[in-house]
């Protein structure tokens, strides 16, 4: 096992990534105030693709895309288009901080799906404990935070389905997308997701121009969370290995809650804090039971479940 120490620069980049991805829920809340959800989702994938495409081309990361066109297109639907739509519709009735906590349940869905899809990823020992702890957290949130109205409960269900879609995309990236780097795969998926979303977005274009704030929020979300965030994450991945780099994923819901409370004036309840602690700790246990760092863990490693996508 190769141990890699986290430098101050690596910690800084990791915190920046977590802050960007955590901010995606706040930006979503702002964007959907004045944008149809399909339009918002298209702007998010389109801006991400515009940021990543020149870099992927310069690095030769799209080599093999022609051979993997259909798997990458499917990845774009499952990993990007579907969850972005679900998250957009879900956040219409759920506060951004709570949305961040619910979506952070992705590793729990991964552990559950592994029972049927991938025995190598199946939970054992502390992974099962983490799965149980995380499920308790989700049930707590659904019972205390989402039970106020049918709209809120349905919104929470959409957010959990979005997390499930992220988890499915991880398995899809491992089993179907071969011979491409994570950068190439996520860039191709951004392009594919944009193609799929375009006709739906055109059909839901508003009669009037959207406000500057919501439009800027959607574009910033795509450029920073979708584009720059991934590039910085790959940098941390190269310097520290996957086990340490994934710390960013567990900081995301905390940033989402802070942004929601401080910038959007959302309430912070004891149930939300307890749910955050249970879901994040359970997800960490479920996802880290077999993690190892190897010398080959670089941004150019081939696509694996955690390497393309649980985000953001």
Region roles according to the model:
Residues 52, 73, 105, 113, ...:
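Hydrophobic transmembrane alpha-helices of multi-pass small-molecule transport proteins
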Residues 52, 110-116, 131-134, 148-204, ...:
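Transmembrane alpha-helical segments that form core, pore/gating elements
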Residues 2-4, 45-46, 143-144, 198, ...:
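C-terminal-most transmembrane helix of multi-pass membrane proteins
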Residues 19-28, 53-103, 113, 140, ...:
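Specific transmembrane alpha-helical segments of multi-pass solute transporters/efflux pumps
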Residues 39-50, 78-79, 84-122, 126, ...:
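Specific alpha-helical transmembrane segments that line the substrate/conduction pathway
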Residues 1-42, 89, 148-175, 299-312:
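Glycine-/small-residue-enriched transmembrane alpha-helix faces in small-molecule transporters
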